[in-house]
């Protein structure tokens, strides 16, 4: 069945996308896919309440990271890496904080105010909520 959807070009619509999670301190608002991409590309650095955004990611070769970038942001991991490297080497910005595991992602987002990250599915935790974007 998936091969039929893939051949029709519909597979990404039905693919399981990673869940974007935020610390409960992040102000609730509706964000666009462009805003979301800018946050993870480290181009949008401040939440609407004026607090700095803390971005957490997984390694480029992590399957959850690949799924997140492709299905949630409609990009490829190497495109993000290139943008982060360009900002880092030019001194105009920094790369997000890279974590080693999904469990570490959950812990960091849960304990870091204004944090954003992604996981394969939302954990049941009052200090974490899903990020609302269209």
Task: Please tell me what each predicted stretch does.
Residues 1-3:
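Sec-dependent N-terminal signal peptides
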Residues 10-12:
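N-terminal signal peptide c-region/cleavage motif recognized by signal peptidases
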Residues 18-134:
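Exported/periplasmic ABC-transporter solute-binding proteins
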